[in-house]
C-alpha cells in the first residue's frame, strides 16, 4: 500500500484517539503499553518490552550502520480540576484534538510511529529504533533510563515533545529538594512551643529571591520554585514540623551537586536531594542534524523542562 501524508495523518489521529481513551498516568501505563505493543505487532513488527516501555527495530538491522532512535513517552500527568470535560474522551473541535496527553506527548508518540513505519518500507542507510517509554513525567528510573543500556549503540536520537516543530538542543536539569524544619509542639493559646512554620519562612524567602550568578545563553538562569508545603495537625496546636518541596531547574553551568552545596550554605533547615542524576544536557549547535534543521527554517532553543 502506498502511504501519503493524509493517510498517515488519519492513522496517527485514530491511534492517538485510542491512546487518549486509555488512562496512562505515570507508573500506571500498563494498559496503554499493552495496546500500543499490540498495534505495532499488527503492523508486522516484532516488539521488545521492559516494564511499560515498548520498542521495535527496523527490518534488516545492521550493527555496521548508524542507528537513529525515535522516542517519546506514553505517560501523562494527572488531570487537574480545571478540566471541563472528560479528559479521557477524545474530541475534535475546530481542527484540534482535545484529551489528556493529546499534546504531551501522544501526538509525538503516534507521529514518530508513522514515520518509523513509513521509513521501514524501504531500505535506509541507517537503522531505526522506535521506543515508546514510560515514567517520563516523573523522571522515573523504570522509564527510558532502564531500557537504553540494553539497546544497540545509538548514534542520534529524536525525542518527540510539543515544541511546535522547533528543535530543542539543550534542556535544563532537575533537582527536587525535601526541606524540613523541626520545632516543638505546644498549645496555640499559650506562650509555649517552637513553631516550625516560622522556622521555614526565611528559607522560603531565600529560595524565592536568590539568583545564581551564571546564566546560560540558551537556558537562562537557574530557576528555583517552592511548590509544596505541609505543616500542622489542627488549629490549636503549634506545629513541631514543617516540610516543603523545592523544584530546581539547572543550566549547564552548574551541576546539581554544585547547586546543592551552595544552597546548604544559605538555608538553616535540613535539606535532602531526591536525586542528583538529572543534570542539564545539550547538543552542539554545529552538529550536522542541527545545522540541517536550521537550513529548513527551524530555530534551535533551550527547553526549561
Give the residues covered by each predicted segment.
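Active-site metal-coordination/substrate-binding segment of hydrolases
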Residues: 65-129
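Short glycine/proline-enriched loop/turn "hinge" motifs that connect secondary-structure elements
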Residues: 80, 168-174, 237-239
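Acidic/histidine-rich catalytic neighborhood of metal-dependent amide-processing enzymes
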Residues: 109-176, 180
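N-terminal helical capping/dimerization or prosegment-like subdomains
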Residues: 1-79, 241-245, 259-262
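Buried hydrophobic positions in well-ordered alpha/beta secondary-structure cores of metabolic enzymes
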Residues: 23, 40, 56, 70-73, ...
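Metal-dependent amide/peptide-bond hydrolase catalytic core
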Residues: 7, 178-305
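Short glycine/proline-enriched coil/turn segments at helix->beta-strand junctions
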Residues: 41-45, 50-52, 64-65, 121-125, ...
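Short glycine/serine- and small hydrophobic-enriched flexible loop segments
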Residues: 18, 114-121, 202-209
